[in-house]
Amino acid sequence: TAPGDDAGLFLTNLRVRGWMDHETLSQHRPDLVMVTLTGDRHGRPQVDYTVNPALGIPHMTGPADSDDPVAHALPAWDLIAGNMCVSALLAAERHRLRGHGGQEVEIALKDVAAATLGHLGMIGDVTLNTEDRGKSGNALYGAYGQDFVCADGRRVMVIGLTDRQWRGICKATGTVEAMTALEQRLDVSLAEEGNRWRFRDDITAILKPWFAQRRVPDFEAAFNDAGLTWSEFRSVREAVELDPDLSTENPIFSEVMQPGIGRFRVPSHPASFGAAERVDARPAPTLGQHTEEILSNVAGCSSTEIAQLFDAGIVQSPSFAKPRNAA
């Protein structure tokens, strides 16, 4: 509620009531912009791992021969909701900068997921068609994309989504004639991505031996020179150790010493702005790091009052416990 163009912005994922709600805070700053992320539109609590199964995604995730739902590790709805909250905050601030005042904005996590399903066509798909979309393992839904195990035991993902990608795969693997024969046998054109999806098992049967007979280094350079869309399966540790895009060669990354934890690579914003130089990532504030500064500069407490708060155990300075993992 402080004055100025760079203040009066409040983003929270708590169902705030009383002194922290919009009605109360806006009495101190009428043009306050407040964005609240809730669980669902009814006010019930939700998290990514409850929204995801409720909307059917686990039933289309995992091995094709399994009926068990699979809750994937990526918190997709949290990530999308976070970006939507920022977009909403900036949109409301833009509204305010045009002289139209502040406002309260509410976004529900489940609504974010439901809207995304609609945007992806999944709601229309099950409404207009008779079959649910099932599991397809690592296959790219709707076109062609498949993982293959190579002679050195390494696994790669190869994509034939567009016509150019598809023709590139066939040429690089020397399977043009075999794919043409498959088209003639099935009486279809594999230039159509829907047919590549429909007959993906037949296509994979042709390509699988080619990869099984070769190590990744045998075709890596040729695939890259041909502009194919492919990658290798790696663990997070392997990616951090081997992929230059996760190293400081990539300008979004810099080495940061995080107090109480250690030194590791941290990304800044992935966007590059032409009108501003990139700012490297900085250590995250530690709990209690700015306690005295806030009490003094924001709350207006005297040094004596601050000392009394510390002595009473109401506030404290940073303390570093044993490092823990991300969970």
Q: Model segments located where?
A:
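Short amphipathic alpha-helix with an adjacent loop that forms part of the alpha/beta core around
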Residues: 1-3
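Short, surface-exposed loop/helix-turn segments at secondary-structure junctions
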Residues: 48, 124-133, 173, 181-183, ...
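Flexible, small-/acidic-enriched active-site or ligand-binding loops
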Residues: 259-308
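Conserved PLP cofactor-binding pocket of PLP-dependent enzymes
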Residues: 224-247
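Amphipathic terminal alpha-helices
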Residues: 304-327
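Aromatic-enriched alpha-helical interface/lid elements that frame and gate functional surfaces
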Residues: 144-226, 230
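Active-site-adjacent "lid/gating" segments in soluble enzymes
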Residues: 5-6, 14-161, 168
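Short Gly/Pro-enriched turn/cap motifs at secondary-structure boundaries
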Residues: 132-140, 146-147, 198, 261-264, ...
